[in-house]
From Swiss-Prot:
Organism: Saccharomyces cerevisiae (strain ATCC 204508 / S288c)
Name of this chain's protein: Pheromone alpha factor receptor
Chain intervals with Polar residues compositional bias: 379-389
Positions annotated as glycosylated: N25, N32
Phenotype upon changing G60A: Substantially reduces dimerization and signaling without affecting agonist binding
Annotated localization: Cell membrane
Phosphothreonine, modified sites: T329, T363, T382, T411, T414
Ranges where the record places region Disordered: 379-406
Reported modifications of this chain: Undergoes hyperphosphorylation of the C-terminal cytoplasmic domain after binding of the alpha-factor, which leads to internalization by endocytosis. Monoubiquitination at Lys-337 triggers internalization of STE2.
Tissue expression remark: Expressed in MATa strains but not in MATalpha strains.
InterPro entries: GPCR_STE2 (IPR000366), STE2_TM1-TM2_sf (IPR027458)
Task of the protein: Fungal class D1 G-protein-coupled receptor that acts as an alpha-factor pheromone receptor performing pheromone-dependent signal transduction involved in cellular conjugation, mating projection assembly, and in cell fusion. Following alpha-factor-binding, the signal is transmitted via a tripartite G protein consisting of alpha-, beta- and gamma-subunits (GAP1, STE4 and STE8 respectively) that prepares the cell for conjugation. In the inactive state, the cytoplasmic end of transmembrane domain 7 (TMD7) is unstructured and packs between TMD1-6, blocking the G protein coupling site.
Oligomeric form and interacting partners: Homodimer. Might also for higher order homooligomers such as homotetramers. Oligomerization is mediated significantly by transmembrane domain 1 (TMD1), possibly in concert with the N-terminal extracellular domain and TMD2. Interaction with GPA1, its dedicated G-alpha protein.
Amino acid sequence: MSDAAPSLSNLFYDPTYNPGQSTINYTSIYGNGSTITFDELQGLVNSTVTQAIMFGVRCGAAALTLIVMWMTSRSRKTPIFIINQVSLFLIILHSALYFKYLLSNYSSVTYALTGFPQFISRGDVHVYGATNIIQVLLVASIETSLVFQIKVIFTGDNFKRIGLMLTSISFTLGIATVTMYFVSAVKGMIVTYNDVSATQDKYFNASTILLASSINFMSFVLVVKLILAIRSRRFLGLKQFDSFHILLIMSCQSLLVPSIIFILAYSLKPNQGTDVLTTVATLLAVLSLPLSSMWATAANNASKTNTITSDFTTSTDRFYPGTLSSFQTDSINNDAKSSLRSRLYDLYPRRKETTSDKHSERTFVSETADDIEKNQFYQLPTPTSSKNTRIGPFADASYKEGEVEPVDMYTPDTAADEEARKFWTEDNNNL
């Protein structure tokens, strides 16, 4: 037996030689002369590995979010909690079925190169069909969440007609998206059961485009509506972190980013590995809703109401003007203050005050933690009360009914608060 090393090929000394362009000869359904380069083979392997990584990350992130939600949520029977739980469970189930698909012969390199149908078992086809059906249910849960947010943002709003119209459009678009995904899944299974090598790219592409369109449309509606609402609240001096801010964060994180990713998935070349962007967009849409809700709720628990336009400060257990020493002195400058604020509030149209305007409560942040789950929206405070007894956080413990005569208290901010209350409850058709 000779110990001499085998001679090296002349290509070893050629610096311009690319081994990735070397060909492999194998037998396929087209005969014995089938060839493939090492670069093409490596591309198939990289595509499978990339899909496995993305679905592994998706499964782990969804499972972790599901556990955290069960640990932190205080109310588990609200619609938003149920929708989030269903979406997370479906994304875990879909990822698990996709793992089975990746490990089956259907997704193997052998079948991709040779194309022999006898290499595919009926169990592999069943897993493929179940994966498509779970994907339909996942898209349905995402669309339900989007339509639910559209409904929530217009609940109790003065724009009832516009809100009903936009909710109907969103619902129709969501139904069309889910229907197209269902048609794509059924058509794909029918074709696959007859011929495992057949595909239905037309229906799948149409369903993905509809999903991207629905996300783009509903994100635009939510963001525009919420920006207008928050602008109005800031104009009134409300700086606390409430339901409008929570929904704005949810809409930005869970809708705008997936919209951009969906657009990139169709604008970039598929050979650059952009086919997994659709999976990333779906993951962000499912994860961001509960994560944003929990983060916003935690921020609310530590926040306090703070107003910009208030001229009052608290001293001991009573409520006194913060800058002047008496109500007589305050009344002198009140006309100038209310006049300036009235001109500012006149930037927005007003309507006649209704009876319900007199029963609004002061906004507190202690109940805001469950705001996103109960769909409750707080109102502006009533500056004065027609009753003798004072209530609220500034109630005087030493005050007894009947000790003083009923008087009409007029503070420096009475006129301004009246204008703010009118504006907040108005039916503003110009926004």
